[in-house]
């Protein structure tokens, strides 16, 4: 791109982590193997840093498509007013109906956000990139009506702290 006249380039890299679009919680900086794995990821980081290109790794701290170590889709998710796991469905653009073929996403309880951010930051040794972007924390705001109730204003405070920590 630089060879073709693009002078200012900034990368916001999405779906780069282990699980890709499956939305595993980013508790470590493990690259998706389908993108070349850790070796290629480190080489890309070095090349971008050498060329002075800022890179922001996108992190999703609100959505899970399945359980993972330490985060169960039954216990770590937010709960609806009916006390059932809060789920976000995907919709077909053509009909606005729920897409029954697409995986739905469980919404992580705001109470779990700080834990996930701390785990991620604890796993980072050398940060060879510019920073993080946390798109979903800026796009969604929801309550958790589970045992440990979290209202929207409390969720906003928790997410603001998470963004500050990142």
Locate each region found by the language model.
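Catalytic cores of secreted/periplasmic lytic hydrolases that degrade extracellular macromolecules
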Residues: 5
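Aromatic- and carboxylate-enriched substrate-binding clefts and catalytic-loop regions
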Residues: 8-166
